A protein has these predicted regions:
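Short amphipathic alpha-helical interaction segments
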Residues: 48-62
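Short His/Asp/Glu-rich catalytic/ion-coordination signatures at enzyme active sites or charged loops
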Residues: 82
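Short alpha-helical segments that sit at the start of domains
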Residues: 2-27
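Minor-groove-contacting beta-hairpin "wing" of winged helix-turn-helix DNA-binding domains
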Residues: 72-79
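Amphipathic alpha-helical dimerization/coiled-coil segments
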Residues: 2-3, 85-106
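A short, conserved structural fragment
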Residues: 62-72
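Residues within the helices of the helix-turn-helix
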Residues: 30, 40-41, 59, 72
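Short amphipathic alpha-helical interface segments
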Residues: 21-37, 45
Length: 106
């Protein structure tokens, strides 16, 4: 059984890591949307993520145009809905890709 898990992680580890990162970014974005303006310490407390991971997520979300810093903490931008729409479309594409990969296994 251990071989199976090792094999699984070596084949899919990058994808799993990136999906985990995406999940964290979405958790941070949702928290900013619901509680903003909000600072790093409070985000860390609310999400249970270390502050350095919160900083990275905030930088990524800011670069993507979903949030912006303010004197009182991070706030969502007017572009957040466009960002979420693009993300939803991309996840739909991922779903199709995953289904195609499953078909290749058969």
């Amino acid at each position: 059984m251990a071989e199976k898990n090792d094999s699984r992680s070596s084949i899919t580890s990058v994808a799993e890591k990136e999906l985990g990162l995406l999940s964290r970014h979405l958790d941070v974005l949702k928290t900013v949307k619901e509680h903003g303006p909000i600072g790093i310490i409070r985000l860390s407390q609310m999400t249970g993520q270390p502050q350095h991971m919160i900083r990275y997520s905030l930088r990524t979300l800011e670069k993507g145009g979903a949030i912006t810093p303010s004197p009182n903490g991070a706030v969502i931008t007017d572009d957040v809905h466009e960002t979420l729409g693009t993300l939803e479309s991309t996840l739909d594409d991922f779903t199709v890709t995953v289904q195609d990969l499953k078909k290749k296994l058969k």
